[in-house]
């Protein structure tokens, strides 16, 4: 297999099958954006890449190539080849790429070949694959009907979506639940990685027999992850389904999400004492983030109730007081905001109903 190259026509198959990719770009490039199925095994480290880049600007390509060879030579070169070979041994069907599928890809492939290891490199590299995924996102709204799932905070939209083959879970991809209290313990990925993962999820969805693309009715920003503008515009024009749930069920669901799950997660990560401190800070800082919209008086009332609930939780292992501030937050903040937004899209509402009724409606939509 002399100088095997993976053609651009195979990008779709690579993403759908989560084909293992050896990314030989520098760590700083990988950190800015990468694909979920890739592993960073750089040809050059950040400092080496910077020196070669400076040399290229000052003295041209040949001087830069010569410098690269002098920087990655001897034991350093051998270590990198061994790391690549080890990866290929664990992933025999691996491909490799650099940023553009150019010199770094070709050199890495050549060094591996000299070591007796054959690995194809991907035509166009990361840049071309990234452009392909951007195109997937831009084209997705035209592929099939788009439906937007709306509903009051705590009505269980995410739980519902996870049960439907028509759905793509935007909040799961963003690693954020969308609301002011929506952050998770692990930080969100970069904007580029969010877009890459969204595109791959859309590709996977297109292989199903779903009759529509079902998405949660999101703001432009999900935490700090921004929906691509053309995709967001299509969502804003989509027909709407409204999921309904009782207030009691909403309260219990939010207590479980905001309190029980987050507290358990922080304690598991940090231990009981530091975990409770981090959990308390998560709640209080989430409230601070909407202080201006609440107003000083309302914020203070909620903060006092929240602190009382935290005190009761740590002293009595009782989370019942959390229901008080959550209830107030719903009725004074989230619900009025939701009802205002729903009024602006009332003409696009196709159906309103409970979880069961919504499942039945979508099942019938699937067979139309």
From Swiss-Prot:
Residues 15-138 form the Rhodanese domain. GO terms for biological process: tRNA wobble uridine modification. It catalyses: 5-methylaminomethyl-2-thiouridine(34) in tRNA + selenophosphate + (2E)-geranyl diphosphate + H2O + H(+) = 5-methylaminomethyl-2-selenouridine(34) in tRNA + (2E)-thiogeraniol + phosphate + diphosphate; 5-methylaminomethyl-2-thiouridine(34) in tRNA + (2E)-geranyl diphosphate = 5-methylaminomethyl-S-(2E)-geranyl-thiouridine(34) in tRNA + diphosphate; 5-methylaminomethyl-S-(2E)-geranyl-thiouridine(34) in tRNA + selenophosphate + H(+) = 5-methylaminomethyl-2-(Se-phospho)selenouridine(34) in tRNA + (2E)-thiogeraniol; 5-methylaminomethyl-2-(Se-phospho)selenouridine(34) in tRNA + H2O = 5-methylaminomethyl-2-selenouridine(34) in tRNA + phosphate. It holds the Pfam family Rhodanese. CDD domains: RHOD_YbbB. Its EC number is 2.9.1.3. Keywords: Selenium, Transferase. The active site is at residue 98. The keyword RNA-binding does not apply. Monomer. Involved in the post-transcriptional modification of the uridine at the wobble position (U34) of tRNA(Lys), tRNA(Glu) and tRNA(Gln). Catalyzes the conversion of 2-thiouridine (S2U-RNA) to 2-selenouridine (Se2U-RNA). Acts in a two-step process involving geranylation of 2-thiouridine (S2U) to S-geranyl-2-thiouridine (geS2U) and subsequent selenation of the latter derivative to 2-selenouridine (Se2U) in the tRNA chain. Belongs to the SelU family. This is tRNA 2-selenouridine synthase. The lineage of its organism: Bacteria, Pseudomonadati, Pseudomonadota, Gammaproteobacteria, Alteromonadales. The gene is selU.
